[in-house]
Amino acid sequence: MIYNFVPRYLVMTGIAAGTDSGKMNYGDVVVATTAWDYRAGKDVREEERSEHINTIKPFTIETSFINWVRELSKDEESLRKISDDFQGKKPETKLKLLHGSVVSGASVVTDEEIVKGILKEQSRDILALEMEIYGVYYAANWAIKPRPKFVAIKSISDFADAHKMDDFHQYASYTSAKVFEKLAKDYFDYDF
């Protein structure tokens, strides 16, 4: 698709699982400044136990995106309006826009011990887990020039634990899309 359409921007929106319910809430938006596949590497067996040895190969978005997100994250009025305009079920928390590392994997995680293991073994600063961002970043990074600028904007719909529910999926999808809309209208450069 990148080869055929040669987009200037490649943006992914959607939902993700947060890693820390004490620092983020349902619907909070996470911009993946860095992403990698948390299962990349190799599995080895040593005596009586198996171990996964990670090979972390992250992709990072352009600095301009990071600066735009930092600026928008301070715009409490815009974030409040995004939340207030949603007509469905939503949490009673203030919407936040976060940015940082997000990891991708091939399966849905509903086990907080897996999340704790990823945070311990790879980076305690990972904000979210999901299944697609790394693939998008990989494709954009290795595209034939001109490469698109790429960014993923996902919102927290659960915390990858046994309490996984769908109550806030619509709200999370909405906040993700609305933050993208705000960035696209107010920050993206369309001069070709």
Short names for language-model regions:
Residues 1-192:
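Intrinsic-disorder/coil detector with helix-boundary
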